[in-house]
Amino acid sequence: MHLDHIYIKGFRNFKEATVHFNKHSLVIGANDVGKTNLIYAMRLLLDRSLSDYDYELSDSDFYAYEDTNEVIIRIYFTDVKDDCIVARMPGKISDDGKMVLQYRVVKNNKKVDYHFYCGKSDSDEDLGEIDSPFYRKFLNLKYISSRRDFWGFINKSKNLLLNQAKENRAPETIIADDALYEEITKKLEYVDEKIPELSYVKNATEQLNKALDKLSIHHREQKIVFDTSTTEIDRVISSVSLASKHEDKNMIIGGEGRINQIYLSLWASQNENSDLSNEVSIICVEEPEAYLHPHQQRELAAYLGKALKGEVILTSHSPFIVSEFSPNSIIRLYKYENETLVASDGCSKVIEEGIDGLGYRMSVIPAEAFFSDYAILVEGPSELLLYKTLATQLGLDLDR
């Protein structure tokens, strides 16, 4: 199954745009050009983490630079052959494996009505209204924001790692683990008996109990003590934390780049190990290069493309990723007057031929031109110094 393209009309900074995708696609463009808005348009149709409240668009979600009362987002799929889709969408897929999903919002006197549609094509005869986006249970989008909650996700996912490792044990390993489990349990019970014998643990709440006794005679029936119970071995195991180990010494994991790599690797491994036979998922990751050096940016982008199942869409500001990415899989967004446009309607042979035409000249410096509105071509380093000096003398900041 392939997400071929998306059509957007009247949504945020998109007046009307069509964006084509490949199996692995890279969305680039300047800041505030609309990369996140493009991904959110897809999420409105496919992200099962969104609620009914999210579908009720606000005034700011409609195209702002003209009087707009309608939003249409339409996604086109081709090569729909997956059993989990075909079996659950009877009559919605054409003989040549095409399917269309549509989300339409109409604003009338501040009242917003939204509807979902599905069909073999985008014609009025084929595109029928459906009650809800029920298909998200087996056809969905998984999204990683550029603002990642590193430790929240890592702490939430550690139990999944433990359970996966637990399920993959050999029979002889299970026997050895069970014996060790019993041994640890007995030692924890011994610790539980000894900790309350420490004088400062036993007497720490003495003043508190005296104060409670003065407040009410009923407090005499119960004493307040520190709970030192550690005998729940499962709770002890679940409370383990990730750390970096060097020569038998544990260290706190440091560096945002390192944490970012752990986050994405953990997320990718979960996706790789999960059973996706009953669903088709499109993966969207915003700015995977955060906090990483150039060579690690390239390596991480390549890793995500290989490790993640299904179609992968990345957004990036990194010329290092652009210079190594497949040319016919690059989607460039740019602004013209008050709307966001898509170069060559997304992934296309035109962009591939243009990049391939650079040949050996393709590097990080030419790749920066993809993020620019204009490019000044110079012959060599001398001319480059000349233009930089000239700009400085004229008070022009070329990076602005």
Give short role names for the model-derived ranges.
Residues F153-K156, A165-V285:
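Extended helical coiled-coil dimerization/tether regions that scaffold
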Residues T68-I73, D96-L101, K137-L141, G310, ...:
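Short glycine-/polar-rich loops that comprise or flank the Walker A/P-loop
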Residues M1-D47, I237, S241-E368, A375, ...:
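Switch/communication elements of ASCE P-loop NTPase nucleotide-binding domains
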Residues V19-H20, Y63-N69, K92-D96, K107-N109, ...:
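Conserved catalytic network of the ASCE P-loop NTPase/AAA+ motor domain
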Residues V80-E182:
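Electropositive, glycine-dotted interaction segments
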Residues F77-D79, S145-R148, S244-H246, Y334, ...:
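Flexible glycine-/small-residue-rich
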Residues I39-D95:
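Conserved P-loop NTP-binding catalytic core
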